[in-house]
Amino acid sequence: QAAGLMIAAINAVMASLGICDRTIHCKNEGPALCGIEMIKYFKENHYDENILIVGYQPSIISNLTANMKNVRVLDLNPDNIGYEKCGAIIEDGERAMKGAVEWADVILCTGSTVCNGTLVDYLDTGKKTYFFGTTLAGTAKLLDLDRLCFADIV
């Protein structure tokens, strides 16, 4: 909980200073529209590549699995691991991480990795890595991470 409060404070201060943007989560049809924008981006930039999604975000997963050739998904939630959801078998984010990263050409990580401490696992993989969502807004700016967030579009 303390990490979440710190991340929220960083985002609020940095947004109020105009240093980062898109710090408010999408509502209503926003997540579905985000998934559509994400697939447009990946079709244009990473069509034939192996895509590893880190974190369970249904709209993004369902859009990428339906439109891209090779997608794997990692998550830490035991309620998701081992089940097929949104067109993908959700793999254990701890046990399958090393092999999944080796397999991937590109990695798409939830911004929640900054809260649960797994962000560091994806910083120096040697793979093109994007972080998505609003949670990571301030941290992405501070660490100069590639961030995909379509909140301003949706």
Protein language model regions, located:
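Short His-Asn-centered micro-motif
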Residues: 54-56, 74-76, 93, 109-112, ...
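Electropositive, gly/pro-rich neighborhoods at or near active sites that engage anionic ligands
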Residues: 1-58, 63
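C-terminal functional extensions of proteins
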Residues: 118-154
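Short acidic low-complexity segments
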Residues: 90-102
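Structural motif
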Residues: 50, 105-106
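Residues at the starts of beta-strands that form the adenosine-phosphate
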Residues: 50, 69-72, 128
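Histidine/lysine/aspartate-rich catalytic loop segments that bind and position anionic ligands
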Residues: 56-91
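Short, conserved loop/helix-junction motifs that constitute active-site signature segments
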Residues: 64-67, 101-102, 121-127
